Every structure is written in C-alpha cells, then in structure tokens.
C-alpha cells in the first residue's frame, strides 16, 4: 500500500497520497478530506457555486443529513460562477478573506457548465491566496484525474480528492 501511495503521489505531483480501496466513493473520499482539515469555527467557501447533492448533505446545506460539517461548527459560504461558467475571481477574493478553505469542484457535476481547466484552478488559487495566504485550496477532482499532463496540486491546489471508480480505475474499480 505504501509503495502504491508513493507512486500515486508522484503521478499527481503531490507531497503524499492516500490511495485506498476503503474509500467507497468520491463523496466518501471528499468527506474524509473535509472532516480531516476543517474544525469548528472554520469557514469553507465553495467557489464554483453550490456543490452537487451528495456533498451538500456532507456539508449540511441541504438540511437533511445528521453529522454534517455545519453541525460540527464549520461555516459555509459560496461564490457562484459567472454567467459564462468561469470563476468569479473578484467574488472569490472577497469571500475567501478569513476562510480556512477554498473549495473547487472541477467537474461540471450535474450542472450545465464546462469543467474547470488547470489554468482556471491556478487563477482561483492565486486569487484566494492573495487575500488569505494560509488558505487551503481543495479540489474535488472527480472525473478530472489524468485528463491532462498535470494535476491541480501542480497548479496551486493544496489538497485534491477524487474517485478510483472513475478515471484512475477505468470504470472497473469495485470501490473508491
């Protein structure tokens, strides 16, 4: 397991990696990352608009799930994308001041928008870190793994989570 995680860290340009079949889905992996980093009183800002439904439950913004981040005392805010589907860098700079996490959903999810490019992820990271240098830029990279020569962690993201069921597992991984 350790060697596989070392290889995955190299492939993604990351300091370290957790590459485990124990993560049952992308949402499970994202949840582990969010609960591992955020603490009561911290604020996360979703900078690509409202996250998709399963993650909305993890955060607590749908009001139907128990044991979510908001119940844990994490504050939530969001910045919608601009009308053309690109990040609102001015809005990101305004809302990320004082925040612990800048959260980027790279893929379109269930929205009618294009996936974010690495250049856009880098621009978002720069905008957030310009106003809050110690902010953690996290990327939901589900469906984004191995689609380009670099990964978000090589373009300004501090933390990235994805799903083995999708691109890395080629659709044949039984979990993760």
Identify the role of each PLM range.
Residues 3, 7-10, 24-176:
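Conserved PLP-enzyme active-site core in the AAT-like
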Residues 14-23:
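Early transmembrane hairpin of solute transport permeases
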């Amino acid at each position: 397991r350790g060697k596989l995680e070392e290889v995955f860290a190299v492939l993604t340009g990351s300091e370290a990696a957790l590459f485990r079949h124990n993560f049952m889905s992308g949402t499970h992996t994202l949840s582990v990352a969010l609960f591992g980093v955020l603490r009561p009183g911290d604020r996360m800002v979703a900078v690509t608009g409202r996250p998709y439904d399963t993650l909305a439950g993890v955060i607590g913004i749908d009001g139907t799930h128990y044991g979510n981040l908001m119940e844990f005392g994490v504050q939530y805010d969001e910045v919608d994308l601009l009308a053309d589907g690109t990040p609102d860098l001015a809005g990101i700079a305004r809302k990320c001041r004082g925040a612990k996490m800048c959260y980027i959903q790279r893929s379109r999810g269930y929205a009618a928008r294009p996936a974010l490019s690495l250049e856009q992820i880098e621009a978002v990271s720069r905008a957030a870190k310009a106003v809050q240098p110690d902010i953690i830029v996290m990327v939901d990279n589900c469906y984004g793994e191995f689609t380009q020569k670099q990964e978000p962690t090589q373009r300004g993201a501090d933390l990235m989570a994805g799903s083995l069921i999708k691109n890395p597992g080629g659709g044949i991984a039984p979990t993760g």
